[in-house]
């Protein structure tokens, strides 16, 4: 999510409510906010995934690189070891003109992880799309603006009778709200919320499934 610091950690009790409904996540993204500020939450979240046997193929962790502690490194490693595939797993640095320069010592710490990708989040926004929200509304028209609202695709697997949700970046906020995309700012949450972790996923996506079948 975009916007100013919110000074709040992920509420694990909110996440736990929805995990029994999930059997597999193809690509799990841990972002924020800033995940390096709460390695204990990362560890406890992993314990919940283990408790409910939620399979994860890949994990993608995005950090600003300002505070790389041994606890954060260990939490990243634990998540990497938990994943089944790891073909796309990575820890990436937010490196662009809008972020402060990252200390080289912190970069070296991250390089100790084999799945560290030091170029994946290096973006020249003069050549790439920006989101027309928040401070980006004030950028000049030389920058390309990207539409970001995406309609998810959902279907029922006939053999397993399970709900499959694809073609979207389904996101859970720190407060337990479920969004169809995480590329928004905090102030936009109410406008893009499709439910919360108290809801049943099948009920949230019933209309989409009915439209397809």
What are these regions (language model features)?
Residues 2, 53, 126-127, 135, ...:
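Arginine residue identity/basic-tract feature
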């Amino acid at each position: 999510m975009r916007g100013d610091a919110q000074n709040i950690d992920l509420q694990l009790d909110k996440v736990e409510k929805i995990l029994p409904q999930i059997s597999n996540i193809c690509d799990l993204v841990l972002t924020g906010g800033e995940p390096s500020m709460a390695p204990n939450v990362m560890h406890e979240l992993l314990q919940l995934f283990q408790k409910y046997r939620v399979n994860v193929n890949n994990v993608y962790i995005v950090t600003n690189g300002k505070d790389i502690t041994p606890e954060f490194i260990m939490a990243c490693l634990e998540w990497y070891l938990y994943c089944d595939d790891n073909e796309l797993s990575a820890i990436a640095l937010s490196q662009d003109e809008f972020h402060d320069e990252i200390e080289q010592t912190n970069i070296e710490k991250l390089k100790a992880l084999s799945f560290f990708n030091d170029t994946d989040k290096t973006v020249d926004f003069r050549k790439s799309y920006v989101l027309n929200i928040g401070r980006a509304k004030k950028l000049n028209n030389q920058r390309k603006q990207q539409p970001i609202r995406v309609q998810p695709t959902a279907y029922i697997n006939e053999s397993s009778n399970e709900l499959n949700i694809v073609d979207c970046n389904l996101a859970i906020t720190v407060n337990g709200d479920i969004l169809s995309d995480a590329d928004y700012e905090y102030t936009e949450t109410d406008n893009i919320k499709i439910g919360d972790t108290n809801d049943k996923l099948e009920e949230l996506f019933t209309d989409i499934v009915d439209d397809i079948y």
